[in-house]
């Protein structure tokens, strides 16, 4: 039995002419062949499971007998039968067509009741003080102003009066609201903002912020499987390449202190129901790590060594987003909010067949995961797929990288709506967020390891901390690889990085025995000394003209992306990115002109996401490149490389500006930066 609170016809006359002033009424419009447009005040009732309309607002020929009459409960506790329905009716709201599959006929004293089935069909449904919002076709929001006064037009004779060429006078509308709600626009000074706001606008803003807090509270928990909030819609499966194999790795030895810590953590995991005792033939050892992050939070982290299992299972090829692509989405945005999924992977349930593959050993015994554990190679792709499925429709103002969600907007007004829509979607899917990691309405925010601030970006402070904490004397190749990995992570912010890395990179060759000399220690000290801070780089806006400047030497190439910012008639060139690399062995034998051309090509490849499909400027001190672009090669096999390069460059739109070597400040800058390290 569908549950729907309605008034009886008798009650309608007695009660429904007065409604609660906080009721939600919006304007709606119906069109029927042979009739004038029918404008209605629709009541949005999320407590009603169905859409209900009066027989006096929809022509009789559009009503049909229901295949199965339904029973509904009304306000006095009794039940009535509804047997008439209207199929696939189009309700026009705020100029948008909303198709309703089924509308039921019942006299409630209101012309049209929009029930919860409509709200779910066009979710997320968001209510603010002055408006409601539906998402049309789940792709863009439709703002609908609330009415401060509502009337009923559907009475005897109304439809006759609405027929085209009808001379019947339309009946007088019946008021169904207590009174018109009026809020005088008395302005008050907001000194901290340096501007003036009306009391009404201030009240509305406060109400919206309160709504955001309420929505955030609904989706936050310390338990990633909170039974009151999760919908358990994210599921995953893992398969062995050879199902007949048992993957076993021998257990580890544990100190008394570690045994005590394991005892606490295993109990916590059992209480959360993310693990359970296992009889699996598979086995991987668990161990504890206590790195900087763990020391900051005061708790060691349990890790399972799934290296053998990862080799034995089928991978997931779903791509993680390209970080540069994500950053292009936020160009020019002024206000940000970010959210972190609580223990993200643990929100994905494993099917029963996959759970034994996650079995691990620890001092307390043999356990397996009910959820996707950290350490499985498939975990990031599995989680990204689910998050993309949930948030793809909001790509214009939201991006997701695994378990990090960033919302970005041009102004606070838009941002209130955008954040509300994202939190509503989390609530709908049961995606649980960490409240302590939520950052709301920030002009400066951390995302993807970057500090984003007023159109600039740079690596977060902990990147420099990691670099400086490395010892000057490294113990082995693994430690050197970690150090070079951090430098590579920050490569966009370090000019001529390839040259800086080269002496250290040479030590990682397989045929070179490990040896760390006093000279290596001095070089390491100089590298760290010259990386005391990363410059904030400009995030180019779509309308700004872009420039690439390049340089090549015998062994290396370098490039820089710049943007021309126009401010009060003055052009300023701002640095956006650096790029560098080493020439391959064969390329080192190229003529210097070809190396300069290759430097241009490599730089364009590095910054292609910004250079497609815009028109940009290439600036170089190489006189050959400008003529090379316009040369007409005639298929000489010796010039095949040049023909290929010309064809590749033809896909881009650019001008070439030659500058004198003495004016090439970029090349001077690169040389100066490199010489600092080598001096």
From Swiss-Prot:
Its EC number is 3.4.23.-, 2.7.7.49. It catalyses: DNA(n) + a 2'-deoxyribonucleoside 5'-triphosphate = DNA(n+1) + diphosphate. It holds the Pfam family RVT_1. Residues 272-452 form the Reverse transcriptase domain. PANTHER family: POL PROTEIN, RIBONUCLEASE H. The polymerase/reverse transcriptase (RT) and ribonuclease H (RH) domains are structured in five subdomains: finger, palm, thumb, connection and RNase H. Within the palm subdomain, the 'primer grip' region is thought to be involved in the positioning of the primer terminus for accommodating the incoming nucleotide. The RH domain stabilizes the association of RT with primer-template. Encodes for at least two polypeptides: protease (PR) and reverse transcriptase (RT). The protease processes the polyprotein in cis. Reverse transcriptase is multifunctional enzyme that converts the viral RNA genome into dsDNA in viral cytoplasmic capsids. This enzyme displays a DNA polymerase activity that can copy either DNA or RNA templates, and a ribonuclease H (RNase H) activity that cleaves the RNA strand of RNA-DNA heteroduplexes in a partially processive 3'- to 5'-endonucleasic mode. This is Enzymatic polyprotein. It comes from Cauliflower mosaic virus (strain Strasbourg).
């Amino acid at each position: 039995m569908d549950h729907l609170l309605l008034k009886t016809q008798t009650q309608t006359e007695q009660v429904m002419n007065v409604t609660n002033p906080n009721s939600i009424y919006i304007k709606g419009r119906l069109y029927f062949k042979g009739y004038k447009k029918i404008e209605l005040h629709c009541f949005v009732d999320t407590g009603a499971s169905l859409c209900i309309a009066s027989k006096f607002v929809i022509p009789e020929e559009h009503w049909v007998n229901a295949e199965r009459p339904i029973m509904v409960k009304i306000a006095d506790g009794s039940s009535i039968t509804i047997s008439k329905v209207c199929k696939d009716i189009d309700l026009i709201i705020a100029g948008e067509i909303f198709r309703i599959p089924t509308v039921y006929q019942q006299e409630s004293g209101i012309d049209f009741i929009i029930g919860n089935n409509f709200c779910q069909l066009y979710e997320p449904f968001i209510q603010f003080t002055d408006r409601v919002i539906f998402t049309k076709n789940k792709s863009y929001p439709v703002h609908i102003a609330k009415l401060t006064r509502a009337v009923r037009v559907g009475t005897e004779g109304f439809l006759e009066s609405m027929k085209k060429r009808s001379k019947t006078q339309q009946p007088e509308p019946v008021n169904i609201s207590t009174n018109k709600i009026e809020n005088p626009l008395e302005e008050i000074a907001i000194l901290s903002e340096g501007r003036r706001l009306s009391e009404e606008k201030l009240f509305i803003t406060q109400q919206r912020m309160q709504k955001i807090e309420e929505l955030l509270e609904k989706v936050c928990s310390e338990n990633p499987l909170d039974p009151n909030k999760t919908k358990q819609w994210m599921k995953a499966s893992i398969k062995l390449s050879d199902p007949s194999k048992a993957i076993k790795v021998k257990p580890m030895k544990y100190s008394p202190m570690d045994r005590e810590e394991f005892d606490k953590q295993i109990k916590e995991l059992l209480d959360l129901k993310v693990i359970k005792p296992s009889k699996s033939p598979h086995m991987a050892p668990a161990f504890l790590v206590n790195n900087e992050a763990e020391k900051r939070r005061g708790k060691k982290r349990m890790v399972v060594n799934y290296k053998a299992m990862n080799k034995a299972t089928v991978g997931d090829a779903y791509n993680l987003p390209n970080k540069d692509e994500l950053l292009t989405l936020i160009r020019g945005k002024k206000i940000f909010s970010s959210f972190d999924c609580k223990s993200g992977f643990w929100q994905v349930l494993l099917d029963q067949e996959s759970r034994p593959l996650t079995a691990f050993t620890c001092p307390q015994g043999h356990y397996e995961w009910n959820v996707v554990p950290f350490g499985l190679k498939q975990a990031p792709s599995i989680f990204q797929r689910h998050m993309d499925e949930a948030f793809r429709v909001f790509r214009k103002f939201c991006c997701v990288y695994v378990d990090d969600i960033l919302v970005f907007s041009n102004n606070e007004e838009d941002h209130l709506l955008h954040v509300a829509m994202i939190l509503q979607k989390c609530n709908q899917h049961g995606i649980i967020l960490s409240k302590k990691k939520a950052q709301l309405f920030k002009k400066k925010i951390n995302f993807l390891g970057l500090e984003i601030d007023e159109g600039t970006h740079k690596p977060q402070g902990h990147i420099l901390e990691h670099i400086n904490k490395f010892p000057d004397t490294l113990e082995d190749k693994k430690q050197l690889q970690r150090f070079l990995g951090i430098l590579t992570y920050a490569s966009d912010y370090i000019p001529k990085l390839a040259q800086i890395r080269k002496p250290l990179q040479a030590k990682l060759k397989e045929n070179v025995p490990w040896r760390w000399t006093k000279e290596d220690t001095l070089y390491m000290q100089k590298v760290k000394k010259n990386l005391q801070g990363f410059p904030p780089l400009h995030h180019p806006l779509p309308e700004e003209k872009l420039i690439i400047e390049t340089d090549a030497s015998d062994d290396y190439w370098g490039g820089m992306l710049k943007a021309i910012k126009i401010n009060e008639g003055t052009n300023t060139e701002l640095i956006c990115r650096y790029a560098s690399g080493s020439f391959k062995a064969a390329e080192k034998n190229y003529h210097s002109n070809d190396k300069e051309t290759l430097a241009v090509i490599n730089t364009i490849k590095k910054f292609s996401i910004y250079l497609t499909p815009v028109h940009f400027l290439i600036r170089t001190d190489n006189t050959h490149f400008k003529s090379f672009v316009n040369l007409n090669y005639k298929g000489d096999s010796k010039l095949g490389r040049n023909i290929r390069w010309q064809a590749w460059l033809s896909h881009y739109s650019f001008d070439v500006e030659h500058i004198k070597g003495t004016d090439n400040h970029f090349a001077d800058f690169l040389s100066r930066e490199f010489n600092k390290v080598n001096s």
